[in-house]
């Protein structure tokens, strides 16, 4: 047992010394480089020479865009390359080692910060290591999560484009001490992780030399302009399409007949559904008072649309149920709504001639137009004084017999001249005259009822014409309003 322990201990010691022997050149190199190294002094031989910093930003992820607080959160990799003459060596003296990785906190680094940082540290963390090359070139690529200030314009939300800038530069050194050189002309997007809400259109970079009011020196900065476009699919499905459907239901209110009694009910139901929908999506819309978002304008447009439909529906129902006892139809209403507008909108109304042609001809002539079935128990068998086709109807048989006998009496008592109506009426019996007078009274009442019904039908037709007018008006307003609102961002996007 003791021999086994001795064997294991010997193997561990051998492995340890072997590892130390393999890293011994790197250990000597590290000790030689930082023996007299001062990390607070710029790595230049001449104090008047600037340190050339090659700088590039790589976008890893666009985390979030906060429209309310005007903040863009990004995950970036900042690439710094410069030359430090104090960190040079001959690879031959150190086992051929050409590269060495050292903690970035032990070497001099440029203090590159994000000028328009909104939250958190302005400078990146130095916990990552830097790569040193035997020629003195230092490559340092620290990752960082920045929350930069960005002026968000939500006018065309959810079809909006944003331009967010990120300004990097040295906070302490002017151009005479540190000169920045941009690597490439755009932000590096090779390792970019696609966002589910935003798409990056382009991200050009620019170098600026600016003289600030506080100082006489010129400071160099590198600014990236990030042009991003919101992906509107989520908002289209969950916000815009429901609003379009609600607007379509509002249009159908004017196609619903007034007699069904459900026009106002449908209007109120549509308004309630829109109100509930607005409460649900309130948190989705950017809550800002600077501008009204496009989707907010459309929701407001739909709300006014539905409210106006309720007002018009109440007016149409008021017109629909008017009677001669309560309202007199003006001449201009009859001219415009019964004659002019129906022809313009291709509305056809059955005329009185067509209705009369569909009725059967009466059995009585002009001289006996007031004859009718005067038996109250049998008057239910016939309609409007016309002979029915049922030969067993006693009422119609009686009318035929009376008409035949009366015609015979008139023929026998008449001469070659035409029959005098007064004589014709005088030969009737008193009972017959009373019956005829009663029938006259009934006929006059029926005529008055028919005239009143015609006026009521005219009011109903006026209400139908008004409904048809607003049906087309609301269809046009819905189409033009929707197209006008949502074509604006498309035309703006083409200019970018």
Curated annotation (Swiss-Prot):
Protein name (database record): Neuronal acetylcholine receptor subunit alpha-3
Family statement drawn from the similarity comment of this UniProt entry: Belongs to the ligand-gated ion channel (TC 1.A.9) family. Acetylcholine receptor (TC 1.A.9.1) subfamily. Alpha-3/CHRNA3 sub-subfamily.
PROSITE patterns on file: NEUROTR_ION_CHANNEL
Pfam families: Neur_chan_LBD, Neur_chan_memb
UniProt organism field: Gallus gallus
Regulation: Activated by a myriad of ligands such as acetylcholine, cytisine, nicotine, choline and epibatidine. The heteropentamer CHRNA3:CHRNB2 activity is blocked by alpha-conotoxins ImI, ImII, PnIA, GID and MII. The heteropentamer CHRNA3:CHRNB4 activity is blocked by the alpha-conotoxin ImI and AuIB.
NCBIfam families, per the entry: LIC
Glycosylation site residues: 46, 163
UniProt gene name: CHRNA3
Binding site for Na(+): 262
Subunit structure: Neuronal AChR is composed of two different types of subunits: alpha and beta. CHRNA3/Alpha-3 subunit can be combined to CHRNB2/beta-2 or CHRNB4/beta-4 to give rise to functional receptors.
Keyword annotations of the record: Cell membrane, Disulfide bond, Endoplasmic reticulum, Glycoprotein, Golgi apparatus, Ion channel, Ion transport, Ligand-gated ion channel, Membrane, Metal-binding, Receptor, Signal, Sodium, Synapse, Transmembrane, Transmembrane helix, Transport
Regions that span the bilayer: 242-257, 260-276, 299-317, 466-484
Major location category of this protein: membrane
Localization per Swiss-Prot or TrEMBL: Synaptic cell membrane; Cell membrane; Endoplasmic reticulum; Golgi apparatus
């Amino acid at each position: 047992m003791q021999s086994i322990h001795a064997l294991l201990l010997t193997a561990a010691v051998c492995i340890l010394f072997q590892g130390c022997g393999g890293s011994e050149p790197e250990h000597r190199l590290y000790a030689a480089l930082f023996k007299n190294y001062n990390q607070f002094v710029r790595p230049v031989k001449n104090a008047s020479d600037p340190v050339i910093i090659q700088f590039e930003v790589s976008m890893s992820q666009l985390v979030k865009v906060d429209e309310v607080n005007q903040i863009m959160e990004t995950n970036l990799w900042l690439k710094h390359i410069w030359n430090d003459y104090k960190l040079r060596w001959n690879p031959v003296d150190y086992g051929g080692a050409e590269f060495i990785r050292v903690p970035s906190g032990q070497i001099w680094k440029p203090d590159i910060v994000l000028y328009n940082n909104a939250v958190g540290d302005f400078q990146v963390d130095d916990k990552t290591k830097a790569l040193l090359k035997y020629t003195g070139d230092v490559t340092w690529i620290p990752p960082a999560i920045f929350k930069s200030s960005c002026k968000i314009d939500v006018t065309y939300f959810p079809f909006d484009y944003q331009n967010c800038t990120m300004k990097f530069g040295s906070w302490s050194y002017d151009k005479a001490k540190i000169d920045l050189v941009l690597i490439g002309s755009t932000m590096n997007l090779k390792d970019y992780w696609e966002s589910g809400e935003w798409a990056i259109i382009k991200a050009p970079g620019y170098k600026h030399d600016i003289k600030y009011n506080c100082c006489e020196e010129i400071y160099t900065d590198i600014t990236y302009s990030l042009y991003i476009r919101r992906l509107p699919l989520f908002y289209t499905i969950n916000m815009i399409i429901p609003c379009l459907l609600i607007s379509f239901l509002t249009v159908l209110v004017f196609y619903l007949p007034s007699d069904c009694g459900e026009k106002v009910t449908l209007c109120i139901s549509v308004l309630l559904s829109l109100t509930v929908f607005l409460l649900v999506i309130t948190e989705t819309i950017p809550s800002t008072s600077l501008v009204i978002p496009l989707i907010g304008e459309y929701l407001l447009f739909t709300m006014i649309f539905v409210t106006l439909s309720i007002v018009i529906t109440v007016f149409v129902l008021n017109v629909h149920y008017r009677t001669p006892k309560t309202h007199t139809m003006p001449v201009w209403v009859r001219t415009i709504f019964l004659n002019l507008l129906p022809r313009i909108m291709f509305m056809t109304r059955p005329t009185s001639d067509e209705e009369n042609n569909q009725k059967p001809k009466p059995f009585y002539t002009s001289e006996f137009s007031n004859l009718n079935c005067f038996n109250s128990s049998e008057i239910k068998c016939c309609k409007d004084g016309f002979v029915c086709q049922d030969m067993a109807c006693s009422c119609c048989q009686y009318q035929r017999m009376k008409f035949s006998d009366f015609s015979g009496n008139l023929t026998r008592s008449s001469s070659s001249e035409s029959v005098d109506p007064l004589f014709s009426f005088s030969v009737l019996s008193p009972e017959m005259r009373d019956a005829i007078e009663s029938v006259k009274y009934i006929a006059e009442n029926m005529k008055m009822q028919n005239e009143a019904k015609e006026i009521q039908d005219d009011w109903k037709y006026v209400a139908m014409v008004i409904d048809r007018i607003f049906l087309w008006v609301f269809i046009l307003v819905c189409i033009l309003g929707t197209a006008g609102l949502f074509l604006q961002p498309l035309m703006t996007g083409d200019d970018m």
